[in-house]
């Protein structure tokens, strides 16, 4: 009986590793202009408005990933100074294990063109977001509004 238990336990352990969601780490940037409006992007391949960002590549730091994604999606370049981290958020929808680090960016300039994957880049007041803003984006903006958008 103990042999059967051991076999079942080992089988359970192996199968449970296949059930586990792959951990992914991504970055999003809440870029503010001089009027505290928020930069949002609309992708060419999906509906809705989102904070710019994306996945962190193997060997890439969080800051480097944020800088790369901002450059690709918005043309925004950042100075050498560190940016503010607002928080780390998790999503376990659709059997995923996504973890997103949200940065607040106030010091930036435009210096490059936008990737063809981006249909539109625009700035919006936090209380006047466009129709189609994703629920997660809206939640992040509300959370940041309490700490970073106060004059």
Locations of the language-model features?
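Acidic, metal-coordinating catalytic segment for phosphate/diphosphate chemistry
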Residues: 1-28
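Conserved hydrophobic/aromatic beta-strand scaffold that supports enzyme active sites
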Residues: 30, 40, 102-104, 123
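NUDIX/MutT-family hydrolases
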Residues: 104, 113-145
């Amino acid at each position: 009986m103990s042999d059967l238990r051991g076999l079942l336990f080992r089988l359970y352990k192996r199968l449970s590793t296949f059930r586990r969601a792959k951990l992914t780490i991504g970055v999003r940037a809440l870029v503010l202009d001089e009027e505290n409006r928020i930069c949002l992007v609309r992708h060419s391949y999906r509906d809705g408005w989102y904070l710019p960002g994306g996945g962190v590549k193997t060997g890439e730091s969080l800051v480097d990933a944020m800088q790369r994604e901002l450059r690709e999606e918005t043309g925004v370049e950042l100075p050498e100074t560190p940016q503010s981290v607002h928080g780390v958020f998790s999503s376990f929808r659709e059997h995923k294990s996504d973890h997103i680090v949200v940065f607040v960016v106030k010091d930036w300039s435009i210096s490059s063109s936008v990737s063809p994957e981006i249909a539109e880049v625009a700035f919006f007041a936090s209380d006047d977001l466009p129709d189609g803003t994703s629920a997660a984006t809206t939640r992040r903006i509300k959370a940041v509004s309490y700490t970073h958008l106060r004059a």
